[in-house]
């Protein structure tokens, strides 16, 4: 049996006090109990470091850490109302963005030199690639991914498409990033052909791959009603574009789904910082709570489904 609820304070100052251990604890509790609701959190930048001088480190995104621990995929979908018409007039059905999130490493230098990238295998064999020679200050970023993570992303997307009975679109830029994006394209094709093709065909669903720039044009011309799977930064940008065109980020659900079925619900938007600063100045603010409400109803419905609590699931439906 599980407790009625467990609470973990992911506020910036408490994360600082625990050296971010509370984020790890929250992720592990989410895996243990299967369902969680997460409130919006602050990821510090230079401005926040100045605003909160007690911060000992520019802590990483809690969302990113939780996704990494759970190996989850984020699905974002608009909340549709008859009274709010999409800016794109031909959109009739919701467009769900599936976003794969993985970490990168970046650093800066203030002197001339050269940057190389080296992989050292367990066999002792090394592969080294010259990234760039620079004659002055420069910035570098190294992006990486594990095939197991990409494969989990692909499986989550195909399974979510089957569960929600929606077509699946996937887009990268493999003509430019031939090795990196090419791996994503290959793995999605392998998973589809080997595992999901028969189920898709039985349900009358389509899997479709295209380049990211072509996908954007097709999405704008479409009527909606599909899942659009994107890599990390593509998904971050496109989910905001889709949500704004459907209404606003305040009308967007966000669900993190792990391969083992663990599910975390949250509002797609952040802490609405501008409203908070206006509140501190004594101004009146009006913040749309709809995405937060739907985060709770989603979690309550899932809890009801997992525990056979029909009344709880029905309450979530009625509240929505």
Which sequence ranges carry the predicted segments?
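Short coil/turn connectors at secondary-structure junctions
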Residues: 3, 31-35, 84-85, 90-94, ...
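Glycine-rich phosphate/nucleotide-binding loop
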Residues: 12-14, 219-318
């Amino acid at each position: 049996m599980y407790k009625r609820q467990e609470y973990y304070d992911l506020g910036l100052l408490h994360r600082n006090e625990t050296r971010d251990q509370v984020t790890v604890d929250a992720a592990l509790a989410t895996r243990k109990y299967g369902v969680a609701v997460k409130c919006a959190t602050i990821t510090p930048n230079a401005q926040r470091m100045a605003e909160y001088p007690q911060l000992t480190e520019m802590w990483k995104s809690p969302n990113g850490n939780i996704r990494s621990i759970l190996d989850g995929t984020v699905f974002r979908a608009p909340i549709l109302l008859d009274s709010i018409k999409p800016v794109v007039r031909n959109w009739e059905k919701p467009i769900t963005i599936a976003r794969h999130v993985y970490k990168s490493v970046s650093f800066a230098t203030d002197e001339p030199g050269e940057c190389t990238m080296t992989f050292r295998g367990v066999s002792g064999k090394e592969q080294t690639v010259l990234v760039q020679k620079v004659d002055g200050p420069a910035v570098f970023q190294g992006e990486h991914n594990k095939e197991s993570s990409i494969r989990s992303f692909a499986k989550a997307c195909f399974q979510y498409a089957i569960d929600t009975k929606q077509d699946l679109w996937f887009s990268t830029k493999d003509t430019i990033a031939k090795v990196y994006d090419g791996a994503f394209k290959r793995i999605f094709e392998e998973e589809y052909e080997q595992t999901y093709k028969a189920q898709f065909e039985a349900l009358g669903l389509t899997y479709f791959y295209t380049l990211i720039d072509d996908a954007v044009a097709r999405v704008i011309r479409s009527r909606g009603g599909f899942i659009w799977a994107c890599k990390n930064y593509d998904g971050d940008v496109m989910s905001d574009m889709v949500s704004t065109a459907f209404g606003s980020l305040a009308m967007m659900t966000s669900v993190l789904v792990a391969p083992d079925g663990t599910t975390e619900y949250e509002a797609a938007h952040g802490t609405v910082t501008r409203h908070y600063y206006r509140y501190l100045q004594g101004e009146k603010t009006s913040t749309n709570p709809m995405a937060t409400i739907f985060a709770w109803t989603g979690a309550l419905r899932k809890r009801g489904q997992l525990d056979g609590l029909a009344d709880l699931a029905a309450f979530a439906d009625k509240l929505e």
